[in-house]
Protein backbone atom coordinates (compact mmCIF):
# COMPACT_ATOMS: atom_id res chain seq x y z
CA UNK A 1 0.00 0.00 0.00
CA UNK A 2 1.40 3.39 -1.03
CA UNK A 3 1.73 6.01 1.69
CA UNK A 4 1.95 9.62 0.55
CA UNK A 5 1.84 12.63 2.90
CA UNK A 6 0.83 10.37 5.79
CA UNK A 7 -2.20 9.00 3.93
CA UNK A 8 -2.64 5.42 2.73
CA UNK A 9 -3.59 5.55 -0.94
CA UNK A 10 -6.02 2.74 -1.96
CA UNK A 11 -3.95 0.30 -4.09
CA UNK A 12 -6.74 -0.77 -6.47
CA UNK A 13 -7.50 2.78 -7.68
CA UNK A 14 -6.01 4.59 -10.64
CA UNK A 15 -3.22 6.97 -9.71
CA UNK A 16 -5.30 10.06 -10.57
CA UNK A 17 -8.21 8.99 -8.35
CA UNK A 18 -6.02 7.60 -5.57
CA UNK A 19 -4.24 10.93 -5.11
CA UNK A 20 -7.57 12.62 -4.36
CA UNK A 21 -7.63 10.72 -1.04
CA UNK A 22 -5.21 13.41 0.18
CA UNK A 23 -7.02 16.46 1.60
CA UNK A 24 -6.14 19.40 -0.65
CA UNK A 25 -5.60 17.31 -3.81
CA UNK A 26 -8.54 17.19 -6.21
CA UNK A 27 -8.81 15.73 -9.70
CA UNK A 28 -7.21 18.75 -11.37
CA UNK A 29 -4.19 18.86 -9.05
CA UNK A 30 -3.85 15.05 -9.20
CA UNK A 31 -3.63 15.25 -13.01
CA UNK A 32 -0.97 17.97 -12.79
CA UNK A 33 1.04 15.82 -10.36
CA UNK A 34 0.77 12.78 -12.66
CA UNK A 35 1.82 14.88 -15.67
CA UNK A 36 4.82 16.31 -13.82
CA UNK A 37 5.91 12.79 -12.80
CA UNK A 38 5.26 11.28 -16.23
CA UNK A 39 2.72 8.76 -14.90
CA UNK A 40 -0.38 7.66 -16.84
CA UNK A 41 -3.66 8.56 -15.12
CA UNK A 42 -4.94 5.02 -15.62
CA UNK A 43 -1.98 3.31 -13.93
CA UNK A 44 -3.05 1.55 -10.73
CA UNK A 45 -1.45 2.67 -7.46
CA UNK A 46 -0.29 -0.90 -6.73
CA UNK A 47 1.64 -0.92 -10.05
CA UNK A 48 3.62 2.26 -9.26
CA UNK A 49 7.35 1.76 -8.73
CA UNK A 50 9.24 3.11 -5.73
CA UNK A 51 10.86 5.74 -7.97
CA UNK A 52 7.46 6.92 -9.23
CA UNK A 53 6.11 7.08 -5.67
CA UNK A 54 9.12 9.16 -4.65
CA UNK A 55 8.48 11.56 -7.56
CA UNK A 56 4.83 11.87 -6.47
CA UNK A 57 5.87 12.56 -2.86
CA UNK A 58 8.21 15.33 -4.05
CA UNK A 59 5.43 16.91 -6.12
CA UNK A 60 2.83 16.66 -3.33
CA UNK A 61 5.26 18.21 -0.83
CA UNK A 62 5.19 21.46 -2.85
CA UNK A 63 1.52 22.06 -1.98
CA UNK A 64 -0.25 22.98 1.25
CA UNK A 65 -2.14 19.80 2.14
CA UNK A 66 -3.72 17.83 4.98
CA UNK A 67 -3.19 19.25 8.49
CA UNK A 68 -1.58 22.52 7.37
CA UNK A 69 -4.43 23.24 4.96
CA UNK A 70 -7.10 22.37 7.55
CA UNK A 71 -5.37 24.60 10.11
CA UNK A 72 -5.09 27.46 7.61
CA UNK A 73 -8.79 27.19 6.70
CA UNK A 74 -9.82 27.11 10.36
CA UNK A 75 -7.66 30.15 11.12
CA UNK A 76 -9.16 32.08 8.19
CA UNK A 77 -12.69 31.40 9.47
CA UNK A 78 -11.66 32.30 13.03
CA UNK A 79 -10.16 35.58 11.77
CA UNK A 80 -13.44 36.43 10.02
CA UNK A 81 -15.33 35.81 13.26
CA UNK A 82 -12.87 37.85 15.33
CA UNK A 83 -13.05 40.95 13.14
CA UNK A 84 -16.86 40.78 13.24
CA UNK A 85 -17.50 40.99 9.52
CA UNK A 86 -20.70 39.74 7.89
CA UNK A 87 -19.16 36.42 6.79
CA UNK A 88 -17.79 35.83 10.28
CA UNK A 89 -21.19 36.59 11.79
CA UNK A 90 -22.84 34.09 9.44
CA UNK A 91 -20.22 31.45 10.30
CA UNK A 92 -20.85 32.03 14.01
CA UNK A 93 -24.62 31.64 13.54
CA UNK A 94 -24.24 28.58 11.28
CA UNK A 95 -26.02 30.21 8.34
CA UNK A 96 -25.10 30.44 4.65
CA UNK A 97 -22.76 33.35 3.99
CA UNK A 98 -22.99 33.80 0.25
CA UNK A 99 -26.44 35.35 -0.10
CA UNK A 100 -28.62 32.26 -0.39
CA UNK A 101 -32.19 32.47 0.87
CA UNK A 102 -32.83 31.14 4.36
CA UNK A 103 -36.58 31.53 4.90
CA UNK A 104 -36.98 28.21 3.13
CA UNK A 105 -34.13 25.88 2.19
CA UNK A 106 -30.62 26.19 3.69
CA UNK A 107 -31.28 22.99 5.66
CA UNK A 108 -27.75 21.68 5.18
CA UNK A 109 -26.23 24.69 6.90
CA UNK A 110 -28.98 25.17 9.52
CA UNK A 111 -29.29 21.49 10.46
CA UNK A 112 -32.47 19.47 10.94
CA UNK A 113 -35.76 21.27 11.51
CA UNK A 114 -36.63 22.14 15.06
CA UNK A 115 -40.15 21.30 16.24
CA UNK A 116 -42.55 24.24 16.01
CA UNK A 117 -43.55 25.76 19.35
CA UNK A 118 -47.24 25.35 20.10
CA UNK A 119 -49.18 28.51 21.01
CA UNK A 120 -51.35 26.90 23.74
CA UNK A 121 -52.09 28.92 26.87
Curated annotation (Swiss-Prot):
It comes from the Bacteria. Keywords: Ribonucleoprotein, Ribosomal protein, RNA-binding, rRNA-binding, tRNA-binding. HAMAP family: Ribosomal_uS13 (MF_01315). InterPro entries: Rbsml_uS13_C, Ribosomal_uS13, Ribosomal_uS13-like_H2TH, Ribosomal_uS13_bac-type, Ribosomal_uS13_CS. PROSITE patterns: RIBOSOMAL_S13_1, RIBOSOMAL_S13_2. GO terms for molecular function: rRNA binding; structural constituent of ribosome; tRNA binding. This is Small ribosomal subunit protein uS13. GO terms for biological process: translation. One of its GO terms (cellular component) is small ribosomal subunit. Belongs to the universal ribosomal protein uS13 family. Located at the top of the head of the 30S subunit, it contacts several helices of the 16S rRNA. In the 70S ribosome it contacts the 23S rRNA (bridge B1a) and protein L5 of the 50S subunit (bridge B1b), connecting the 2 subunits; these bridges are implicated in subunit movement. Contacts the tRNAs in the A and P-sites. Part of the 30S ribosomal subunit. Forms a loose heterodimer with protein S19. Forms two bridges to the 50S subunit in the 70S ribosome. Residues 93-121 are annotated as: Disordered. Gene3D superfamilies: 1.10.8.50, 30s ribosomal protein s13, domain 2.
Amino acid sequence: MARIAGINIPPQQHSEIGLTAIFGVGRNRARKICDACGIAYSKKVKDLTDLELEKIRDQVAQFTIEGDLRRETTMNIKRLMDIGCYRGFRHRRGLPMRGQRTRTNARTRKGPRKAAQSLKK
